Amino acid sequence: MLSRREVLMMAPLSAAALRQSTRSRAGAAQPSTPVTFEVPAGACDCHTHVFGDPGRFPFTPNRTYTPESASVDEMRALHRALHTTRVVIVQPSVYGTDNACTVDAIKQLGPGARGIAVIDDQTPDTKLDEMDRDGIRGIRINLATAGQTDPELGRRRFDAAVTRIGRRKWHVQMYTQLSVIEAMQKQIAASPVPVVFDHFGGAQAAGGPTQRGFDVLLDLVRSGRAYVKVSAPYRGSTAAPDFADMGPLAKALIAANVRRILWGTDWPHPDTTPGRASTEISPLRQIDDGRVLNQFGSWASPSERKSILVDNPRELYGF
């Protein structure tokens, strides 16, 4: 959850300028490899984003990157190819606390869609109630995209998010590093609401299951105190295009507690790598999600796949 001070400078970007800069975009990737296992009915992609028309949904000027657009229709094509019928749309950092694009996408997709919002300390409870009716099921704390590694910042945002959730059937979703999770272990273990970690909890393939902090992540999963998304394996891998080197991490998480594992694509795969000006268009990564889903299938048995793809999302997001 962002503080009011952090979003005070937010203002719409010139839509005309942004449209001019996105005319020759590569486009959001679509799977080129067929899925080779039987995807269970009701399977859910638990981590996606939508980047809409900048004239209608302007980016915040203090973002760290500027993505190409990725539409609801393109997302529908993705999920037809993957044989997934449910989806969770996660509010990306480029929109700050303006969740309009995310909520609009949920409404377009209907009852098979849920969402995760970003809020600040000025977001009124009436707005949270409205978003709850619209399908929002959690609050995202994104520390990683801006390179924030201070555990104290994580603690403050976590406490604020839990307080705002109140009695709603929501959870806290965190995108951060293992070092922050390790420092926040006691706080997370005592949380009155579910906690979800994005993208393998920030674990890196090169470190393997013995890397510092991964044991803490496993303990939180094992005890049922946290969920982990085995999503966006390319963020921790050096073995494109299948990202097989993330297998030991995925298998360790599944073995710890299959009922606390989720799967997601991270489509349309925004490239948040530092080095560009924040207003320069960052081309979407061309990830073959068919290959990625097949790789996940090699890490889990059919019964484990059903838990991860169907049962766990149904319970957490209320499908």
Which positions does each model-derived feature cover?
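Active-site gating loops and adjacent loop-to-helix segments of metal-dependent hydrolytic enzymes
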Residues: 51-73, 77-85, 134-146, 193, ...
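Alpha-helical scaffolding within the catalytic cores
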Residues: 71-74, 123-126, 181-182, 209-217
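H/E-rich (His + Asp/Glu) clusters that bind or coordinate divalent metals
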Residues: 26-34, 210-319
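Active-site gating/metal-coordination segments in enzymes
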Residues: 94-179, 186-189, 222, 227-241
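An N-terminally biased module of ancient metal coordination in phosphate/nucleic-acid-related enzymes
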Residues: 8, 27-97
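Bacterial Sec-dependent signal peptides at the C-terminal "C-region" and cleavage site
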Residues: 15-30
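Hydrophobic faces of well-ordered beta-strands that scaffold small-molecule active sites
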Residues: 44-48, 87-90, 115-117, 139-141, ...
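N-terminal secretory signal peptides and thylakoid transit peptides that target proteins
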Residues: 1-14
